[in-house]
Amino acid sequence: GFCAEAGIKCNDIHCCGNLKCKAVGSNRV
């Protein structure tokens, strides 16, 4: 799966599982 953070897709392990990314509202897409 992927996350979208500020319009940027990141790998789950680097974004979804990252507390900073979660804090800014990253979402699975």
Swiss-Prot record:
Expressed by the venom gland. It is found in: Secreted. It comes from the Eukaryota. GO terms for cellular component: extracellular region. Its main location: secreted. Disulfide bonds join C3-C16, C10-C21. Keywords: Disulfide bond, Secreted. Belongs to the neurotoxin 33 family. This is U20-ctenitoxin-Co1a. It comes from Ctenus ornatus. The lineage of its organism: Eukaryota, Metazoa, Ecdysozoa, Arthropoda, Chelicerata.
